[in-house]
Amino acid sequence: MLRKLAAELLGTFVLVFGGCGSVVFAAAFPELGIGFVGVSLAFGLTVLTMIYAVGHISGGHFNPAVTIGLWAGGRFRAVEVIPYIISQVIGGILAAAVLYVIASGQVGFDATTSGFASNGFGEHSPGGFSLQSAIVAEIVLTAIFLIVIIGATDRRAPPGFAPLAIGLALVLINLISIPITNTSVNPARSTAVAIFQNTWALEQLWFFWVMPIIGGIVGGGIYRLLFAEKQ
């Protein structure tokens, strides 16, 4: 069990460090930065590579909504849910702390005013999208993510391609929802950066736990009900 938790901690660390790091650093230059496409690729590539790296140890969740969604889909034991989530949150916070230390070396950096890659809705949505829009986006996209994850790891699926499918799904999800909420679908990712943003991101953090978890349960339940092999 300890090896599984260490794998989840490391995987979530790399996800937050790579994905949120791309937002904090590489997307900060209007003309030279990587933009929405680059950020989307960064999140997808970190998940893809870390599933290949440690997925055989822990399953490669790196996301509390995925862990709960897999449980809802009958693919994960309830007794392991809380330990996995704790490891994921710790890994994310450690990554955000490293990002904060690096970013603090830039003259004029302020995590509060920059947003520090935090997720938000309403006035804190990158595109000014409402709470209602954010609810629909986070639930639907997390549900889709779970359906892809469970389907790609189904024993009937082509072997060896699950990390690629999952990583590309996360790229697509980010391309869709960065303008809406800055893309969460992952409470650990949202928590990690919100702690260092330390104002509005913490006030809205409840949303980025509740909605992705609902979406995860919906996605896991849909796959279990409609697509799982009959026993």
Curated annotation (Swiss-Prot):
Where in this protein would one find the motif NPA 2, according to its record?
A: 186-188
Offer a single GO CC term for the protein.
plasma membrane
Where are the residues marked Involved in tetramerization or stability of the tetramer as a site? C20
Q: Where in the cell is it found?
A: Cell inner membrane
Locate the site labelled Selectivity filter: F43, T183, R189
State the Gene3D superfamilies in the record.
Glycerol uptake facilitator protein (1.20.1080.10)
Q: Any idea what job this protein has? A: Channel that permits osmotically driven movement of water in both directions. It is involved in the osmoregulation and in the maintenance of cell turgor during volume expansion in rapidly growing cells. It mediates rapid entry or exit of water in response to abrupt changes in osmolarity.
What is this protein called in UniProt?
Aquaporin Z
